[in-house]
From Swiss-Prot:
Expressed in cotyledons, rosette leaves, stems, sepals, style, and tip of pedicel in mature siliques. It is found in: Plastid, Chloroplast. One of its GO terms (biological process) is response to cold. Residues 98-178, 213-283 form the ACT domain. This is ACT domain-containing protein ACR11. Keywords: Chloroplast, Plastid, Repeat, Transit peptide. GO terms for cellular component: chloroplast; chloroplast envelope; chloroplast stroma; chloroplast thylakoid membrane; nucleus; stromule. The keyword Repeat applies. PANTHER family: ACT DOMAIN-CONTAINING PROTEIN ACR11, ACT DOMAIN-CONTAINING PROTEIN ACR4-RELATED. Induction: By light. May be involved in feedback regulation of amino acid metabolism. May be involved in the regulation of glutamine metabolism. Residues 1-52 form a transit peptide. The lineage of its organism: Eukaryota, Viridiplantae, Streptophyta, Embryophyta, Tracheophyta. The keyword Glycosyltransferase does not apply.
């Protein structure tokens, strides 16, 4: 079982005019934060391991699939490849992170997945299986082995996501060409990479007086969850809850965010959107910019 890891990347403006323009839009709101409120926990911004993610749901799915060179939906393909789905749910259980994996009726007991989770320093405290029209759902409640608590570190949540997807690609390589992760972990990489400029869409709207709703759509890549959290927290915006969907080559994110327990005002919405757009359209960052 190949292991996967994820690491964050800070947002740095190499162009001074870009940084000044963003600060001019929001004034004092753009000052570098001393602490970050993330999932109702105040933590110093020393490194990404200090950030906490208490109410995030991550979903990874393959919108289309290919098996034996035949596209799903082809008349000649009577055995269609099901859609793999990975959900990491922080809402359902206050004491554990809930992991759910579905791939039609093709998955077994997922002993390899449980072993991979143990290699990440996690314990599987409960497991069950249920069936519905979409297939067999393998559900696990997992905690950190060192503390017995649910996983709240964005880097570890991203490592779980990549490990499970890598595990699916290893045992079901037919989906590799349709997943962004296939370029790194699959036997057949995507044939048509996504244009980041075209694929990136960011919108922010009010969701009551105390929080705003942030929607992000962009090209998926390993480590994206951690990187997005870092960018948002860098301008003192707190992520209260959310959902991270990986659909084929795209990442679709929905975050409930707030600034000092209030919805984001328009200037701060613009700064956040500009910061995310600047980062997402620069998929690689020079080490010298850190």
């Amino acid at each position: 079982m190949a292991m996967a890891s994820a690491s964050g990347s800070a947002l740095c403006f190499t162009d001074a005019s870009s940084s000044l323009a963003l600060r001019r839009d929001c004034g004092a709101l753009c000052l570098p934060p001393r602490t970050v409120t993330f999932g109702f926990v105040d933590k110093p911004l020393v490194n990404l391991e200090r950030l906490r993610l208490s109410t995030l749901k991550i979903r990874a799915s393959n919108a289309t699939a290919v098996e034996n060179g035949k596209q799903e939906g082809s008349a000649a393909d009577s055995d269609k490849v099901p859609t793999p789905v990975v959900i990491i749910d922080q809402d359902s259980d206050p004491d554990a992170t809930v992991l759910e994996v579905t791939f039609g009726d093709r998955l077994g007991a997922l002993l390899d997945t449980m072993n991979a989770l143990k290699n990440l320093g996690l314990n599987v405290v409960k497991a069950n299986v249920y069936l519905d029209s979409s297939g067999k759902h393998n559900k696990f409640a997992i905690t950190r082995a060192d503390s017995g608590r649910k996983v709240e570190d964005p880097e570890l949540l991203e490592a779980i996501r990549l490990t499970v997807i890598n595990n699916l690609l290893e045992f079901h390589p037919e989906s590799s060409s349709q997943l962004a992760m296939g370029a790194a972990f699959g036997v057949l990489p995507p044939t048509e990479p996504i244009d980041v400029d075209i694929a990136t869409h960011i919108t922010i709207e009010d969701d009551g007086p105390d929080r705003s709703l942030l929607f992000i759509e962009s090209a998926d890549r390993p480590g994206l969850l951690v990187e997005l959290v870092k960018i948002i927290s860098d301008i003192s915006v707190a992520v209260e809850s959310g959902e991270f969907d990986t659909e084929g080559l795209l990442a679709k994110v929905k975050f409930h965010v707030s600034y000092r327990n209030k919805a984001l005002i328009k200037p701060l919405q613009q700064v956040l959107a500009n910061s995310l757009r600047y980062f997402l359209r620069r998929p690689s960052t020079d080490e010298s910019s850190f």
